[in-house]
Amino acid sequence: MTLRTLQLRPTDALLVIDMQRDFLPSTPEHSGALAVSGGDAILPGINLLAARFDHVVLTQDWHPRGHISFASAHPGKHPFTDTVATPYGTQTLWPAHCVQDTPGAELDPRLQIPHAELILRKGFRKDIDSYSAFLENDHTIPTGLAGYLRERNLTRLFFCGLAYDFCVGFSALDGAALGFECLVLEDLTRAVALPGSVSHINTCFAAANVRRLSCSDI
């Protein structure tokens, strides 16, 4: 979507979603367990943009060992292609990733946002996943982020990070459903791009009035 240049205001916040080592392409120091292609390319832009925001929230996937979303927790199942039925719906299975207190769960050291006000950990309950920064995948259990933002009168939210078609997208959709104005910075996110996942999230954005823009628009 093409927008006029937006002026940042005191009630804006930048949400940087899951810029963790396991989601980034492999480096000599670490092999990303669930690497999103091109994820490392957005790091410099995120750092530059974050410096323009007074309020920045970082999110961090924080899974226990044997998490329900791990294919390895379901004998005979394979990541990316297999799913399992759960009380909260169909769960896509992934490689084990962002396991609590492991290097892969760490925020990438190239992410330089010293003024970030909050690091929100999600997905830490073994039997339910949490793509969204606002609600777990049952769309009922809150993470507390909405209350945190409302207490600070932060009403317009800009989203970047990983991955566009999952954690970034679900966060923006839930934020919009909770009454926030939500905008996704398409040039500062990358997609996992499972079959149909990008077109599906774009359709959901349009229905929810989540706007898509680039850094040049702000």
Residue ranges and their predicted role:
Residues I113-R152:
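Histidine/lysine/aspartate-rich catalytic loop segments that bind and position anionic ligands
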Residues V168-L178:
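Short Gly/Thr/Asp-enriched flexible loops that form oxyanion-binding sites at enzyme active sites
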